[in-house]
Swiss-Prot record:
Its EC number is 6.3.5.2. NCBIfam families: guaA_Nterm, PRK00758.1. This is GMP synthase [glutamine-hydrolyzing] subunit A. GO terms for molecular function: ATP binding; GMP synthase activity. Catalyzes the synthesis of GMP from XMP. The lineage of its organism: Archaea, Methanobacteriati, Thermoplasmatota, Thermoplasmata, Thermoplasmatales. Disulfide bonds: none annotated. It comes from Picrophilus torridus (strain ATCC 700027 / DSM 9790 / JCM 10055 / NBRC 100828 / KAW 2/3). It catalyses: XMP + L-glutamine + ATP + H2O = GMP + L-glutamate + AMP + diphosphate + 2 H(+).
């Protein structure tokens, strides 16, 4: 099994790689500009977080649109990766009313997809200035916080998932469980 971590310039991309590796899966970090042919053997991809502001810097996200649409593997978007999925679906992302950095309580309304075996509420690590305001009806919004309406979502028919928070950071409770559940989707 092989999972590629698409590097969007996030400070914790190596944590995502290490978490997947520590769960026993071959993983490789690649820049978001790599040719999509490199991902032909992928069983899944993770779109890392990054410093890009979607509104003004979407070009810094390289080829991730092609990576999502060329192959039919599971996709997990983290932070700016999730924001890209929302925009790609026809949703909207813009500046958050309050930039977030630190722990936040995230409440789950549904635990389907990769969000099973997680409590109804977790402490999660946040680090974002932009946030998802809306997403296409093809997706289910399954988690929120008191300041961010879209903390997690999943596609109704495909294995595409997104989280605004950072499950790879130790301060996020049950973050490893989210990665384990994603890996299980990649095994199918």
């Amino acid at each position: 099994m092989k999972i590629y971590i698409i590097d969007n310039g996030g400070q914790w991309t190596h944590r995502e790689w290490r978490t997947v590796r520590d769960l026993g899966v071959d993983s490789t970090i690649v820049p978001n500009t790599v040719d999509a042919d490199v991902l032909a053997d992928a069983d899944g991809i993770i779109l890392s977080g990054g410093p890009a502001s979607i509104e003004s810097e979407i070009s810094k996200l390289g080829n991730i649109k092609e990576y999502m649409h060329r192959y039919n593997y599971p996709v997990l978007g983290i932070c700016v990766g999730a924001q890209f999925i929302a925009i790609d679906s026809g949703g909207r992302v813009s500046k958050a009313l309050h930039a977030e950095y630190g722990k936040k309580i995230v409440n789950f309304t549904s635990k389907d997809g990769i969000f099973y075996n997680i409590p109804d509420s977790i402490n999660a690590w946040e680090n974002h200035n932009d946030e998802i305001k809306s997403i296409s009806d093809d997706y289910i919004i399954c988690a929120y916080s008191d300041t961010c309406r879209v903390q997690a979502f999943y596609h109704k028919n495909r294995d595409i998932f997104g989280v605004q928070f950072h499950p790879e950071v130790n301060n996020t409770e049950h973050g490893t469980t989210i990665f384990k559940n994603f890996i299980e989707k990649c095994r199918r």
